[in-house]
Amino acid sequence: LSDDQFAGSTFDYILSNPPFGREWKNEKAKVEEEAKLGFGGRFGAGLPATSDGQMLFLMTAISKMKDIDKGGSRIAIIHNGSPLFTGDAGSGPSEIRRHILENDLLEAIIALPNDIFYNTGIATYIWVLSNKKAGTVREGKVQLINANEMFVKRRKALGNKRNDISKEDIAEITKIYGDFKESEISQIYDDEDFGYTKITVERPLRDEEGNLVLKKGKKQPDTSLRDTENVPLKEDIKEYFEREVLPFAPDAWVDEKKSKVGYEIPFTRYFYKYEAPRPSAEIMAEIMDLETELSGSLEEVFDL
C-alpha cells in the first residue's frame, strides 16, 4: 500500500485476495499523501478506516485498469462482508462504493460458502469489476449470486477450512454469472438501487410552556429530537418525507444542507427468506405431549 510496485502499469485482468481486517496505520502517512493526488493516484475516491485496509487494495486494482479504448480490464477480488456496507453516507467506504457504482464498474458480487479459508470461517465475497459494461446487457446493472450453499464437505478439516468448492460448483457458478438471468440464487439490480440520500429531520425547539423558540424569527431545531432517514435514490425525497415522517411528526422539516448521498450493498437482505412461525395450536399440542411424557416419567421414578 505504501509502495506501489506497479506504478504506471495497467493490466487486462487483475486477481486479488487481500487480507481481511488488516490495519494500515503503519502506511497511513504515505497513503494519505497519495490520496492528496486525487484520481492521479490510487486512492482518489476516499479512504477507509485505518482498522481495515481491504478497500485500499480494491482501489489499487481499479487504478490499474486499462482505458476502454485500450481494451479495458476485468477484476476479481475477494473481500469479507465489511466492504459491502461499512461506513455511513459521506464516509470513505461509502464514497468508494459510490465511485464504483456511479461509474458502473461493478458487474457482480458472488457470496462464497463459509469455512473455505484456512485462517477464518467468515463469509466472503468475490467482487467482479469491469469497465467494459457499456453497450452490453450488464450496463447499469449489478448481479448478486448467492453461492453460499455450493460446496462439498472436506473429509478432514484444515484449520478453519472445512468446505471445498468443487469443479462442478465452480462450473455452475460460472454458468449462472454468464447467463445473467434471475433465479433463486441470482438477482439483478440497477446500480442506483444501492444508493440512498441520508436526510436530517429536524423538530422545533420549544420552551417549557410548549411555545416555539425563535431566533431572528426562525424556528430553532431541537437537537434532542433530531433524527435521520435513508431515502432510496429512486424515491422522491419530498414524497417520502410526506408519507413516512409528517404523519408522525407534523412539525418536522428536512435540513437540506445536511443531506448526503451514500451507497451500501446489504447482500444478505436481498436473499432473506421469511419463514412463518409455527401455528400456536401446533406448539401447544407439542407442549401438552411433553407434559404428558414428563408426567409419565415422574410416575415411573416414584414407583421405583
Regions found by a protein language model. Give the residues of each.
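Phosphate/diphosphate-binding loops
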Residues: 1
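A conserved structural/catalytic subdomain of Rossmann-like adenosyl-cofactor enzymes
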Residues: 4-299
